[in-house]
Amino acid sequence: MAHKDSVDVALIGAGVISTTLSVMLKQLQPDWSQVIIERLDTPGAESSDPWNNAGTGHSALCELNYTPEVNGKIDISKAVGVNEKFQVSRQFWSYLVEQNVLGDPSEFINKVPHVSFAQGMDQVDYLKARYEALKDHPLFPNMQYSDSDEKFAEFLPLMARGRDFNNPVAISWFDEGTDINYGALTRQYLDAVTAQGVEVRFGNEVKNINRDGSKWKITTKNLHTGDTSMVTANFVFIGAGGMALPLLQKAGIPEIKGYGGFPVSGQWLRCTNPELVEQHQAKVYGKASVGAPPMSVPHLDTRVIDGKKGLLFGPYAGWTPKFLKKGSYLDLFKSLRVGNLPSYLGVGVQEMGLTKYLIEEVLKDQAARVESLREYMPEARAEDWELVTAGQRVQVIKPIGAPKFGSLEFGTALINSNDGSIAGLMGASPGASIAPSAMLEVLERCFGNRIADWAPKLREMIPSYGTRLSKDANLFNEQWDRSQKALKLV
């Protein structure tokens, strides 16, 4: 396909975020030309591919950091919000499968129970209170709870073997949780849009983004030939993971002023021993250690990748100044500006607990990592587990006023120019799980004058569009049943 010099839409990054928007725009505006620019030679290789992330369909079914205890009560507002956004994803994927835009859904989504795990009386009391707070909510149907040692051993044999049950345990669970291969989903997205004429430029790195009247001129370098080229776009979306911050800075929009990025590297322990893999059929999330950040929540997961099952435990965090797994050690330093130095310094002073946690994680050797695993799997053996490096997670540093100046945000942040001609998604979890919801926000912020015209198509793709599913149990149940069938989860 010949390179276009001018396009309606340029998307930077060929991971699950940009490709979600590409597919969405092709449904809404099939006549718009698009180009996707990717510095690597394959899609999703930085963060979307399966061992770069946990593959959890984040819907707050089991992730305890979404249900904090505040003044003795469980606050479920974050859990409800994340769940609603994941239902948008399920509806969008179901529509695309029904329209044959996507292929076999079992290539990217599979049923795996989601389990919350508590150990010690304080955690057990918390988990029981969480269960009571969620069990009657329409978005959390069929939630189950048990503090029986026998039920624990029956459901989680790998975690029960060798465990001292004098220390009380409890679990709550949903049988209808999911494991998602976002790399496979990304490739299905790309197959769909390239068949509709979208150009994908692999091995091309964006060197600059400049205003060109009402448009944007993007300068790219072919990393194989060294050749540079330019493409002009009416609208630019930056879905480039950790590089969203530097690229928005290159664009020079005032909205990015003061923002920074705090890179955290992730690692997993992976097990592919069939004998062990068959004894664990769940994603089991525990509680983060006191003082540890939300991203440190440990979990022992079943993964389903290319039809094969494996186990994952982690995450183990580390620190590097790189903004990408395959980035530069200068990334962080190049992002420093006079305008964001107060934000960085403010976070540095406030987040001493995070600094301590990262130092401890960096110093862990394999023996220490396996010792952490044994809190979940008491009889774990080091020889059954290998260390795998995950994608970089660049947490958002948001500018705030004195006296703190900067705030570390454990989530995602959408930054867009005032005229809506350029936008970028920064941050990490829940990221890929809620990509369709995040891209709807891009459309609403950047194409507000078209939303009314697009509304019928948006409701066709996402029937709950414009509705709070938490306020409409009938619509939730209807769309849940539909997506269960469409995505082959029953």
UniProtKB/Swiss-Prot annotation:
It holds the Pfam family Mqo. It catalyses: (S)-malate + a quinone = a quinol + oxaloacetate. One of its GO terms (biological process) is tricarboxylic acid cycle. Its cofactor is FAD. Pathway: Carbohydrate metabolism; tricarboxylic acid cycle; oxaloacetate from (S)-malate (quinone route): step 1/1. Keywords: FAD, Flavoprotein, Oxidoreductase, Tricarboxylic acid cycle. SUPFAM superfamilies: FAD/NAD(P)-binding domain (SSF51905). One of its GO terms (molecular function) is L-malate dehydrogenase (quinone) activity. Its EC number is 1.1.5.4. Gene3D superfamilies: D-Amino Acid Oxidase, subunit A, domain 2, FAD/NAD(P)-binding domain. InterPro entries: FAD/NAD-bd_sf, MQO. Belongs to the MQO family. NCBIfam families: mal_quin_oxido (TIGR01320), PRK05257.2-1 (NF003606), PRK05257.3-2 (NF003611), PRK13339.1 (NF009875). This is Probable malate:quinone oxidoreductase. It comes from Corynebacterium jeikeium (strain K411). The gene is mqo.
